[in-house]
Amino acid sequence: MSDSPITQRKQDHIDWLLQDEKIERQQAGFDQIQLTHRGLPECDYAQVDSGTTFLQHSLSFPLLISSMTGGASNALNTINENLARAAEHCQVAMAVGSQRTMILDRKAEKSFQLRQFAPTVPLIANMGAIQLNYGFGYDEAQRMVEVLEADALYLHLNPLQEVIQPEGDTNFAKLAEKIAHLKNHLSVPIILKEVGCGLSEKDIQLGLDAGIEWFDLAGRGGTSWSRIEAHRTEDSQQAELGKMFQDWGLTTPQALKQARPFQSQAQFIASGGIRNGIDMVKSVIMGAQICGVAAPLLKPAMASTNATIGTIEQLQQEFRTAQFLLGMPKMADLFLNDSLIVP
C-alpha cells in the first residue's frame, strides 16, 4: 500500500463498505413501484433486445459500472482492471472513482489506465466538482480524461460527504459558473453526478443553465457515504452527525420524478440503490437512459474478472426477463412508458 493519504482514504472506504452491513441502506424505494405483469406477453423471449447506445457506443443493455475506486495500490489497481475487463466482455459502460488521487500522487495513474482493457466501451473519468473551488481547473480535468482515454467526465457533487469527511472541502459557493466554464473548454461531455443523495429540480436547472446535458441522479438508498465517513472520523460529534444524515436525500425514484419535466432538455442516468435488473427496468420506465450499479460489483471485482462478468450477466438476465414479462421486447418500448406501472 502506498503511503499516500488519499490512497489510504480510498482503501478505508472499501474496508468500511465491506465491514458495516448498515452502510447499504436498502431503502431505495424501488419495492414500492409495481409493474404490470403480462400473462400473454405476445413476444418471443429469444428475440428480446435490451441493447442501447450511450456516448456513441453500443451497449448490450443499459448498464453503467458506476464509480468505485482508484489509487496507488495493487489492490485498487486490480479492482479497476477486473471491472474494465468485465465491461469490455459484457459490452457495458464503466466509470472510475475520483481521479484527484492521480493528480496528487502520480503513482496512482496506473489505476486509471484502463482503455487497454476496455477498448470499445464508454469510459467515464471522474473529478469532484468541489475541486473547482480549491485550485483544480481545465488542466487537471483534461489530464484525467486523457489518462483514462475517457468518453466523458463525471463532475461529482457530494456536499454531505464533504461536511462529514475529516478532510472535507465545503465551499460550494458559485460552483455552477465554474462548471459552465469547464464545460465550454473540455474535450468531452460533462455528466453532473450526485453520490447518493439525489439531484433536485433546482440542481438540474442549474446544470442546464451551465450547459450540462447529462445528469446522474444518484439517489439515496444504497451506499451511504455519510455513514462511511462517520466511521473514519475520530470526532465523536462528527460521527454522530454522519449517522444522523445517513438517510438524507431523495431516493432514485423520487429524483427521476423531479427530472421528468426536463426529459426534452437532458438525458438521465439512474443510480443509487439499484440492486437488480428489475430495479433497472423500473428506472428506464421512469426516464433513465442508463442505470449505474456499484456496490454489488465490488466483491466480485476484488475476486476476479470472471466473477464480475457473472454478476453483470445475472443483471442482464434479470433485465431481459422483466422486459419479456412486461411484453416489451425492445428497450425503446420501456422508456417513459407509464402504462407499465400499476396505478
Curated annotation (Swiss-Prot):
Superkingdom classification of source: Bacteria
Q: Where does Mg(2+) bind?
A: 162
Q: Which GO terms describe its cellular component?
A: cytoplasm
- One of its Pfam families is FMN_dh
Sorted alphabetically, the Gene Ontology BP terms of this entry are: isoprenoid biosynthetic process
Entry EC number(s): 5.3.3.2
Residue positions binding substrate = 9-10, 98-100, 161
Q: List required co-factors.
A: FMN; NADPH; Mg(2+)
The catalytic activity, as recorded, is: isopentenyl diphosphate = dimethylallyl diphosphate
Residues the record lists as binding FMN: 66-69, 98, 126, 193, 223, 273-275, 294-295
Q: Where in the cell is it found?
A: Cytoplasm
Mostly located where? cytoplasm
Summary of subunit composition and partner proteins: Homooctamer. Dimer of tetramers.
Function, in words: Involved in the biosynthesis of isoprenoids. Catalyzes the 1,3-allylic rearrangement of the homoallylic substrate isopentenyl (IPP) to its allylic isomer, dimethylallyl diphosphate (DMAPP).
UniProt record similarity statement = Belongs to the IPP isomerase type 2 family.
Put simply, this protein is called: Isopentenyl-diphosphate delta-isomerase
Organism field = Hydrogenovibrio crunogenus (strain DSM 25203 / XCL-2) (Thiomicrospira crunogena)
